[in-house]
Regions:
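Catalytic adenosine-cofactor/nucleotide-binding cores of aminoacyl-tRNA synthetases and other
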Residues: 82, 94-198
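Active-site cores that bind ATP or allylic diphosphates and position pyrophosphate for catalysis
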Residues: 1-103, 108-120, 128, 153
């Protein structure tokens, strides 16, 4: 009740500030790869905007920062699709136009012992750019290989690209909804192509 709330405030009890989610209906947003995505509002929890210490939560600060920085595209993993309606509702509450959303499939690694794939992690080997460079792979070959993970140029079957060619050929619409598997043999082949060209 309002009286109980006031009593807690008068007592100095810590509290959070939440955004009240709609109790009925659905929230729909458009994703470049997945099309129209609709989540029932009953699946959305009232999200915390300000923590007990008065600091904003990541999701709250992120939406504000993206708006103030004029971010045009939010490109992130598919695991964030279910939280996107909360962001959309925040944009609506502020009266702001949401950015373009693109949710990418994860890059997978293959377990050599079982042949099964799972989200790429350190157990699959080197996972950072620097680790791969230290292993002897040319930086340009790594960039070229990673660019082709989950993306296919629409106008060519070319596999070896200069940076300028990648920039020219890239389009979000060429991204795949399906997870790509990181393949060290393919990276080795790509590196060989770069070494031959030196």
């Amino acid at each position: 009740t309002p009286e109980e709330v006031q009593a807690h405030l008068d007592h100095g009890d810590p509290y959070v500030i939440r955004q009240k989610m709609p109790l009925v209906g659905e929230t729909t947003f458009y994703d470049v790869l997945h099309g129209s995505v609709t989540i029932p509002n009953t699946e959305l929890e009232d999200q915390v905007l300000l923590k007990r210490d008065g600091m904003p939560t990541y999701n709250f600060a992120n939406v504000i920062d993206d708006h103030l920085m004029r971010v045009s595209h939010i490109i992130r993993g598919t695991e964030f699709i279910t939280s996107t309606p909360k962001h959309v509702l925040l944009y609506e509450a502020f009266g702001w136009e949401p950015p373009v959303f693109v949710h990418l499939a994860p890059v997978m690694g293959r377990d050599d012992a079982t042949g099964k794939t799972s989200k790429l992690s350190k157990r699959h080997g080197a996972t950072s750019f620097d680790d791969l460079v230290k292993m002897g792979y040319p930086a340009a070959a790594i960039v070229n290989y990673v660019a082709l993970l989950g993306w296919s140029p629409k106008t060519t079957n070319q596999e070896v690209f200069s940076m300028d060619e990648l920039i020219e050929a890239f389009s979000i619409e060429g991204l795949s909804k399906s997870p790509a598997v990181f393949d060290y043999d393919k990276l080795g082949w790509m590196s060989g192509e770069y070494f031959k060209a030196m």
